[in-house]
Amino acid sequence: MAIKEWIITQLSKLTKNKITEESLFSEIGIDSLDLVEHVSDLEQHFDIEISDEELLNIKKVNDIIVLIEQKSK
């Protein structure tokens, strides 16, 4: 499964809202605590580290997709 699909599938478990790459976390009902918990899962799944500074810059689903794609190379 590609990174984008995996992330959207995982995020879909946290909300009933439809999730797309352009979805803002604030609009789909995922708060900062949910995001921190999810990032921990992402770090383990993709064997990467996401810094607190990088986490603060994540506002929409595509932000995290791009970040993980960059770190997975």
Curated annotation (Swiss-Prot):
Domain named Carrier: residues: 1-72
Gene3D superfamilies attached to this UniProt entry: ACP-like
GO cellular component: cytosol; membrane
Record-listed O-(pantetheine 4'-phosphoryl)serine modification sites: S32
Keyword Phosphoprotein: yes
Maturation and modification: 4'-phosphopantetheine is transferred from CoA to a specific serine of the apo-ACP-like protein.
Pathway listed: Lipid metabolism; fatty acid biosynthesis
GO molecular function, a single term: acyl binding
Gene Ontology BP terms: lipid A biosynthetic process
UniProt key word Lipid biosynthesis: yes
Annotated InterPro entries: ACP, ACP-like_sf, PP-bd_ACP
Keyword annotations of the record: Fatty acid biosynthesis, Fatty acid metabolism, Lipid biosynthesis, Lipid metabolism, Phosphopantetheine, Phosphoprotein
Top-level taxon of the source organism: Bacteria
Protein purpose: Carrier of the growing fatty acid chain in fatty acid biosynthesis.
Protein name per UniProt: Acyl carrier protein homolog
Source organism of the structure: Mycoplasmopsis pulmonis (strain UAB CTIP) (Mycoplasma pulmonis)
Highest classification ranks of the organism: Bacteria, Bacillati, Mycoplasmatota, Mycoplasmoidales, Metamycoplasmataceae
